[in-house]
Amino acid sequence: MTIKKLILVRHGESEWNKENRFTGWADVDLSEKGRVEAQQAGNLLKKKGFSFDFAYTSVLRRATNTLSLILDVLQQQNLPIEKSWRLNERHYGALQGLNKSETAAKFGSEQVKQWRRGFSTLPPALNLNDPRAPANDSLYATLNKNDLPLTESLATTVDRVVPYWDEVVKPRIIDGKRVIIVAHGNSIRALVKYVDHLSEEEIMEINIPTAVPLVYEFNSSLQPINHYYLGNAEEITQKVAAVAAQGKA
């Protein structure tokens, strides 16, 4: 049986991750720690002998810069890259920019957990005139404004990620191409839920650490047969726990 592989990487720590703020579609850059994390991810992939034919990422620079740093380490700077807003982080609506712990202190940790991890729970929406609304961002000027969210749940994030997976990424993997996706915690969670057929309750407990390569192995029909993180297991466990704790007061 021929095993096909996919690498998923959440971007390295961003400036707003460092400040424990809801980031969503805000286009913040990597922190210095995040740049180091991205290079470490590249080193892990290089050590394990990975190289790629195609790369996919979002249009947000914390993801695109993570990918660039990884490809620098792999000496694959000329790899074909496709950027899509459909791989963007989930849009956190009016929560975008707020500190997660302060928001938990105000609204309660359980409410914030529902906003962060509930499958269908929508955070409060932005007003269309809010400067944070994607329709007011030149980055999305060529897109239909009706496609651009004012808030998103994980369910609506799945709705935009899955067609991109089915129509763009999946055919390349079936064709035998080696693919890496560098995206965001929730766009990766959306993909993991779909690929692994997880329930709404199961995905609520899944947390994706920054810049740790997640390897998926598939059979020839692209059914998942295994997945695992690259790196030190204890360190990865600590990083996952840190992500889970972000929404606590």
UniProtKB/Swiss-Prot annotation:
Record pathway: Carbohydrate degradation; glycolysis; pyruvate from D-glyceraldehyde 3-phosphate: step 3/5
Keywords, ordered alphabetically: Gluconeogenesis, Glycolysis, Isomerase
Class of this enzyme: isomerase
PROSITE patterns for the chain: PG_MUTASE
EC number(s) on file: 5.4.2.11
Residue positions of the active site: 11, 89
Keyword Transferase: no
Binding sites annotated in the UniProt record for substrate: 10-17, 23-24, 62, 89-92, 100, 116-117, 185-186
BP-aspect Gene Ontology terms: gluconeogenesis; glycolytic process
Reaction catalyzed: (2R)-2-phosphoglycerate = (2R)-3-phosphoglycerate
Alphabetized HAMAP family for the sequence: PGAM_GpmA
Assembly description: Homodimer.
Known role: Catalyzes the interconversion of 2-phosphoglycerate and 3-phosphoglycerate.
Name under which the protein is recorded: 2,3-bisphosphoglycerate-dependent phosphoglycerate mutase
Species in which this protein is naturally found: Hamiltonella defensa subsp. Acyrthosiphon pisum (strain 5AT)
Gene (name only): gpmA
